A protein has these predicted regions:
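Acidic, glycine-rich loop-and-beta core segments that form the ion-binding/anion-interacting portion
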Residues: 62-68, 73-97
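Short, intrinsically disordered, charge-balanced linker/junction segments flanking boundaries
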Residues: 1, 72, 81-89, 126-128, ...
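Beta-strand initiation motifs
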Residues: 39-44, 89-94, 136-142, 196-200
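Beta-propeller blade signature
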Residues: 34-39, 82-89, 128-135, 183-196
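Conserved beta-propeller blade repeats
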Residues: 4-22, 48-67, 93-117, 143-164, ...
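Short, conserved, GDST-rich strand-edge loop motifs in beta-rich repeat architectures
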Residues: 24, 71-77, 119, 166-184
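Alpha-helical transmembrane segments and terminal signal-anchor/GPI-anchor hydrophobic tails
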Residues: 115-116, 125-133, 159
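C-terminal closing repeat unit and adjoining cap/tail of repeat-based domains
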Residues: 170, 175-231
Length: 232
């Protein structure tokens, strides 16, 4: 089957029997958050996007309840943002109030929690990593800062309680608002125990690498990463 070109930002269901995506038609009333079978059949519109497509992160939760985060909640002031959790049947679950702007997130493997990065005045608008409850009935509970200045998409879970992150060696003030302008800043690698919140430096690469993606082996003995500079 051929997937329409205006379908973008795909996320697979936990059993890989469905996809969530943004259907971005030319007209605002033809833009939707939607689901379908992996071959594109049986598509179903979930929520209208209008001109808010850039505020929606498609991310199907491991517990099969949430398919996207939407930064379209009620205004909360300069240093806070309300993020909505959207269900696969259009449910608007309990929202998440985050301490900053530029929300990026990742689910824990069991879907119980999310890690996310935001930037605020308290961090000089550098990205800061947080963890919070992620289930529809616990969204935002136990929210706490992990204490690392990096983005959620530079992290990967080793288990439900272990996180590995690439952390830029240096970040200018304001970097969280303009991540594309950071360039090829080299990273160090950290391991985070999510039970205690302790972050440990585990590697300073011999050569300077800018990590774009981390892959953790099943036994957590090895980390593999894609280097943004070389593409390898």
């Amino acid at each position: 089957a051929t997937i329409p070109r205006h379908w973008q930002s795909f996320s697979f269901s936990p059993r890989s029997d469905g996809i969530a995506f943004l259907s971005l038609g030319i007209e605002e009333d033809a833009r939707w958050l939607a689901v379908a079978s992996p071959d594109g059949s049986g598509s179903r519109a979930i929520e209208p996007l209008g001109n808010n497509a850039s505020k929606v992160q498609v991310a199907w939760s491991p517990n099969d309840q949430v398919i996207a985060f939407s930064r379209t909640g009620q205004p909360q002031g300069l240093n806070e943002q309300e993020v909505l959790l959207i269900g696969k049947n259009g449910e608007n679950f309990r929202s998440l109030i985050v301490n900053g702007l530029g929300f990026q997130s990742r689910w824990s493997p069991d879907g119980e929690r999310i890690i996310y990065s935001v930037s605020s005045g308290s961090s000089d608008w550098r990205p800061q990593l947080w963890i919070a409850g992620g289930k529809p009935d616990t969204a935002g509970e136990g929210k706490r800062s992990i204490g690392l200045n990096t983005w959620a998409d530079k992290c990967s879970f080793g288990s439900a309680t272990t996180l590995y992150c690439a952390v830029p060696k240096t970040l200018e003030a304001g970097a969280g608002l303009y991540p594309a302008a950071v360039g090829n800043t080299p990273d160090n690698l950290y391991r985070v125990d999510l039970t205690t919140g302790a972050a440990q430096l585990i590697a300073i690469p011999a050569e300077e690498h800018t990590v774009s993606q981390i892959i953790v082996s099943d036994d957590e003995r090895f980390l593999y990463f894609t280097d943004r500079i070389s593409g390898q």
